A protein has these predicted regions:
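Active-site HxH/HxHxD metal-binding segment of metal-dependent hydrolases
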Residues: 44-45, 52-128, 150, 209-212, ...
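Short Gly/Pro-enriched turn/cap motifs at secondary-structure boundaries
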Residues: 26-28, 111-112, 131-133
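Short beta-strand or tight-loop elements
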Residues: 19, 123-128, 138-140
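Conserved beta-strand hairpin/beta-sheet module of binuclear metal-dependent hydrolase folds
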Residues: 11-64, 141-155
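A generic "binding-loop/recognition-motif" signal
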Residues: 31, 52-53, 75, 99, ...
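Metallo-beta-lactamase
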Residues: 45, 131, 137-218
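Conserved S/T- and glycine-rich ATP-binding loop of Class I adenylate-forming
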Residues: 38, 72, 132
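Active-site-proximal loop/helix segment associated with metal-binding centers of metalloenzymes
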Residues: 2-5, 9, 16, 25-34, ...
């Protein structure tokens, strides 16, 4: 069975991160974009990638407070509902610093910025910010510590069975190195990887594939 599978247009899936934090996953848009709502037991929620269908995202949020909308990278299939959701919720938008200018140009939204090594805190939720240069210059992943497993939101930088698309060999080398050193090296095999499209996977499932990815160059 695919891990945390959600069909496009279907109901959201609930994932227990720990006793205090839930994760809600929904697929929106025409290319199976994942949006993730990190929902603590108390305090404001965090939305990762306001990709599309602002009405469905707002229905998912309901009357809950959203304190931040974090965009994993600048591509428009991940920012299509950003302006509407920020307006609807009053949430603070965030993104990786190198992608901020491009996001503002396409959405009109000025994001506060984060980058590799930052610790993002909102209420009781803490996210390790991981810069992954390759799919875009400012792509980020977010590590949420859980029990029994950590959860990493990788945008379009890492998927089941492959890395994200890159525009050339230099970008691939950069992304491969960042993913190996910053995601796989410090992670346990039970760590769950939540990509920007499709099903989740685990570090343990993907770690044996790293030499293959390196050899084939994608």
């Amino acid at each position: 069975m695919p891990l945390y599978h959600v069909d496009p247009g279907s109901e959201a899936a609930l994932v227990k991160v720990n006793d205090d934090v839930d994760l809600i996953k929904i697929s929106v848009g025409t290319v199976d974009n994942n949006a993730y709502l990190i929902h603590p037991g108390a305090g404001p929620a965090i939305l990762v990638d306001a990709a599309a269908e602002p009405g469905r995202l707002k229905a998912l949020i309901g009357d809950d407070e959203v304190g931040a909308v974090i965009t994993t990278h600048r591509h428009q299939d991940h920012t299509g509902a950003l302006a509407e959701i920020v307006t609807m919720t009053g949430a603070q938008p965030w993104c990786g610093e190198p992608d901020a200018e491009a996001i503002e140009a396409t959405t009109g939204v000025t994001c506060r910025t984060m980058w590799d090594g930052d610790l993002f805190r909102l209420g009781d939720v803490e996210l390790d910010v991981i810069g992954l240069v390759g799919h875009t210059r400012g792509s980020i992943a977010l590590r949420l510590h859980g029990n029994p497993s950590d959860h990493v939101f990788t945008g379009d930088s890492l998927f089941p069975g492959r890395l994200g698309k890159t525009s050339g060999s230099r970008e691939f080398e950069s992304l491969y190195t960042d993913v190996c050193m910053k995601i796989f090296a410090p992670a346990s095999d039970t760590t769950v990887i939540h990509p920007g499209h499709g099903d989740a996977t685990t570090v343990g499932e993907e770690r044996p594939n790293l030499p293959l990815w390196r050899a084939r160059g994608w």
